[in-house]
């Protein structure tokens, strides 16, 4: 914003919300006479609260530069939100340890393959000196990886099978597959399932950094925590493979790629302010300075034609898989009913791992609470 003002003379004011307070801050800012002209939503559920404020971006220059229509949100025929950063997640893989166990990523092209490799590593864990998976921590710093990111896969495949993009009543068609993958994580890990309730995101990362496990479910945002100054890995040591759950065309499955960050323009603003906002957005994603700031300063991968090439290995893997014709798994978790719903699933998963709850409680939290919410 500062660089844009220096270049164009157009003042840009940025209001930053405290962590976890974006929606509350936006509500108070939108009630003011000088309400923001640019704001963001996290996906279809977030958009539902704000769609009456969203300017139709159809025909705008920024929409014309978007690399895929799947990164825009519509309300009827109107395009009302544009994803401005995309990320991928999957199984971050320590290739060196995998090779020590006698395998390469070419041996893992399905859930059945992954299960075979993981269980073989577990059988030889003492001899090898490492586990298959880092701890599937269910502390709040880590549980989103399972109650949200892993849970995305059964939702995505159900939507694909039913030809829909969201639903008021999830059926849970693929929850057995969700169970199989969660079981694989918790039974082939650095620790006992009963210890997972207290395990954190840092625990999981540190286990991976210390070569204690081959696989670590996380995303492209984790790259700088693993590679670079003072970090133990180089790009040659790591890769990312898809999260296979035994559904669909696994041979052609890509990483889970999408966004929870969409720009919207306030249609209540003066037209001159709307036009100035559209110019600023376009500058961010098309100019040399804007795209460099997005890529280098913020580490964003932006889904626009003029994007800078990312130095991030996991982004390169995603691009390579897509170029090979693999289908990325869309981020459908933005259609989950609420944080409350996710927490219900997380609590049920934690109890299941600890042995104090059964899988039926997970199914109830997933299916029944989706309907009631």
Describe the predicted segments one by one.
Residues 3-68, 80, 96-102, 109, ...:
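Extracytoplasmic "Venus flytrap"/periplasmic binding protein-like
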Residues 11, 99, 123, 289-291, ...:
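Conserved C-terminal helix/tail region of periplasmic/extracytoplasmic solute-binding proteins
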Residues 28-29, 36-37, 63-98, 129-131, ...:
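A structural signal for short loop-to-beta-strand junctions that line the ligand-binding cleft
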Residues 42-92, 145, 149-151, 237-242:
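Hinge/lid segment of periplasmic solute-binding proteins
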Residues 56-69, 133, 137-140, 155-180, ...:
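Short, solvent-exposed loop/beta-turn-alpha elements that line the ligand-binding surface or hinge
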Residues 80-84, 89, 115-167, 213:
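Extracytoplasmic/periplasmic solute-binding protein
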Residues 101, 190, 230-296:
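Extracytoplasmic/periplasmic substrate-recognition and gating elements
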Residues 118-119, 164-198:
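Glycine-centered hinge/linker elements that transmit conformational signals in sensory
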């Amino acid at each position: 914003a500062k660089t844009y003002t220096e270049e164009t003379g157009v003042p840009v004011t940025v209001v930053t919300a405290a962590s976890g307070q974006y929606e509350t801050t936006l509500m108070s800012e939108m009630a003011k006479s000088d309400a923001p002209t640019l704001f963001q939503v996290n996906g279809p559920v977030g958009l539902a609260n704000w769609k009456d404020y969203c300017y139709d971006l159809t025909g705008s220059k920024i929409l014309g530069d978007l690399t895929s229509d799947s990164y825009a949100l519509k309300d009827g025929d109107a395009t009302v939100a544009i994803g401005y950063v995309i990320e991928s997640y999957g199984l971050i893989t320590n290739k060196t340890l995998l090779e020590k166990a006698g395998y390469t990523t070419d041996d893992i092209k399905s859930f059945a393959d992954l299960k075979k490799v993981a269980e073989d590593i577990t059988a030889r864990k003492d001899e090898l000196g490492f586990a298959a998976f880092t701890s599937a921590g269910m502390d709040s710093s880590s549980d989103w990886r399972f109650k949200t990111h892993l849970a995305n896969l059964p939702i995505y495949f159900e939507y694909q099978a039913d030809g829909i993009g969201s639903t008021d009543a999830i059926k849970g068609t693929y929850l057995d597959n969700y169970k199989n993958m969660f079981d694989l994580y918790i039974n082939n890990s650095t620790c006992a399932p009963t210890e997972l309730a207290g395990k954190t995101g840092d625990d999981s990362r540190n286990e991976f950094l210390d070569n204690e496990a081959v696989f670590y479910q996380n995303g492209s945002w984790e790259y700088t925590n693993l590679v670079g100054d003072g970090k133990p890995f180089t790009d040659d040591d790591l890769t990312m493979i898809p999260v296979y759950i035994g559904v669909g065309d696994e041979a052609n499955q890509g990483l889970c790629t999408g966004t929870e960050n969409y720009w919207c323009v306030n249609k209540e603003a003066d037209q001159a302010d709307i036009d100035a906002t559209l110019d600023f957005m376009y500058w961010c994603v098309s100019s040399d300075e804007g795209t460099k700031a997005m890529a280098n300063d913020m580490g964003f991968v932006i889904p626009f034609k003029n994007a800078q090439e990312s130095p991030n290995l996991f982004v390169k893997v995603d691009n390579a898989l897509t170029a090979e014709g693999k289908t990325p798994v869309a981020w459908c978790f933005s259609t989950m009913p609420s944080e409350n719903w996710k927490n219900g699933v997380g609590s049920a998963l934690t109890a299941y791992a600890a042995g104090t709850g059964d899988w039926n409680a997970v199914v109830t939290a997933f299916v029944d609470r989706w309907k009631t919410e």
